[in-house]
């Protein structure tokens, strides 16, 4: 099987979905590997291959520019994370959901409905193995320690009105996340790097229980909340970057 890996650091693009059951290509044609990289706040002038005076050299991106095609007139469905991610996954505007503004946090319910078709589901139907490494930020459904129900925020129907962080059973798998939306493998964080809980997830479970607390120190502007005991702000991206080549190497 060919591999499709999506590295979600943040969203600045959108896609259109193909018809639900339309094959991507003839079954006899070799399908290419697909690597979809999304970067936050990256302008044309930030890439050295497009701007010789760029502040940072980007040799690997420059190789893609010199050996491929470059599009410089792109548009996104939103200027913030959650709605633009929703559009990439589903091909729809996020305002078609009940989320009419703002973004989700680390404890929000799943934004993508169970029966909603997505780009990775389309690829799975066409013989691809799919993976996502990085920031999800589309919500998922936590399991709780009790059968208690919690009131939702009237301004955001996917977000709880009260702090439910101590109500979550972090040892149980969650639903509605990447592996329920078309990805065979997931490694990363539920929401933005500044939202708790500050722990990594693999597939549909946390890889560790948040036993410490992240506190803003004036430099790392995180919302206070649970974190992995030995996790500090500067480490949050590193391990996700280490995981991506592993999946690609296994699929090629």
Predicted regions and their residues:
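Formylglycine-dependent sulfatase
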Residues: 2, 18-252
